[in-house]
């Protein structure tokens, strides 16, 4: 598939978000979370774009909170986005930070004794067989215009990227997000979290300003305590990440780096041993 076709498909998926992102980013800089540090807008992503914790999160003992019953949730970290041949491969996420940072987060969560649930949630862009409204139908069709994928290639497009597939263990959940931007609608995730008495959800994935943010908002509205690992998430465009991270951090959840996540878990383990 030629690069131009990739770009048309990738841009169409985000087209209607442009005005929303601009408006919310402006709101976050006009006094909401005014103490948040300036992110490096020109950075290619990663920990340098992660804002300082918003004032409300600084009042919390994050070590204690991250020692509560927890779940790890990966969103849309599939071959579609990480492989050059994928439907969204032109975004070049393999060249960015989300994959190595996610591996770091998963390994740390596995080593902790309070992570009760691991979910690997796919997001298919080929959604012709999904339940859909009139809006969904035209949006889903627009995402894949010009793409000529066989059924086998469509299936491979939505497979978990190999580096993360190697980290999946028996008992982990693997399923697809069915709604536009929330895994809390129409999937087994709510029952999984409820049955395992989860309080905290740690999110990684793509796209930061779409499914990750949507799931973070849903987690808050359902009474959970979400964390977003900033360098383990990507927007479609790196330049959109600072605004998205600030917005999530100001309104919905603490945004921390993968290194800080590991340190907080280690501190919690040390406290329990003491």
Locations of regions flagged by a protein language model:
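Active-site acidic carboxylates
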Residues: 42-170, 264-273
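A short glycine-rich beta-strand->turn/loop micro-motif centered on a GG-aromatic cluster
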Residues: 202-206, 223-238
């Amino acid at each position: 598939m030629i690069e131009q076709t990739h770009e048309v498909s990738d841009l169409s998926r985000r087209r209607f978000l442009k005005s929303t992102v601009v408006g919310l980013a402006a709101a976050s800089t006009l006094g909401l979370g005014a103490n948040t540090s300036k992110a490096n807008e020109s950075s290619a992503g990663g920990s340098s774009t992660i804002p300082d914790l918003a004032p409300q999160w600084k009042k919390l003992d994050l070590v204690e909170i991250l020692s509560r019953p927890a779940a790890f949730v990966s969103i849309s970290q599939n071959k579609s986005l990480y492989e050059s041949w994928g439907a969204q491969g032109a975004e070049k996420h393999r060249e960015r930070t989300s994959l190595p940072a996610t591996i770091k987060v998963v390994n740390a969560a596995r080593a902790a004794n309070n992570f009760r649930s691991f979910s690997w949630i796919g997001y298919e862009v080929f959604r012709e067989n999904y339940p859909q409204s009139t809006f969904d139908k035209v949006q889903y069709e627009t995402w894949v215009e010009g793409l000529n994928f066989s059924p086998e290639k469509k299936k491979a497009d939505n497979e978990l990227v190999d580096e993360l597939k190697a980290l999946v263990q028996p008992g982990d959940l693997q399923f697809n997000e069915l709604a536009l931007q929330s895994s809390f609608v129409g999937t087994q995730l709510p029952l999984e979290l409820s049955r395992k008495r989860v309080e905290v959800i740690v999110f990684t994935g793509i796209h930061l300003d779409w499914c990750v943010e949507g799931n973070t908002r849903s987690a808050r509205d359902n009474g959970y305590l979400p964390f977003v690992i900033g360098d383990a998430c990507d927007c479609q465009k790196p330049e959109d990440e600072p605004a998205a991270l600030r917005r999530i951090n100001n309104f919905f959840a603490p945004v921390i780096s993968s290194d800080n996540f590991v340190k907080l878990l280690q501190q919690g383990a040390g406290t329990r041993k003491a």
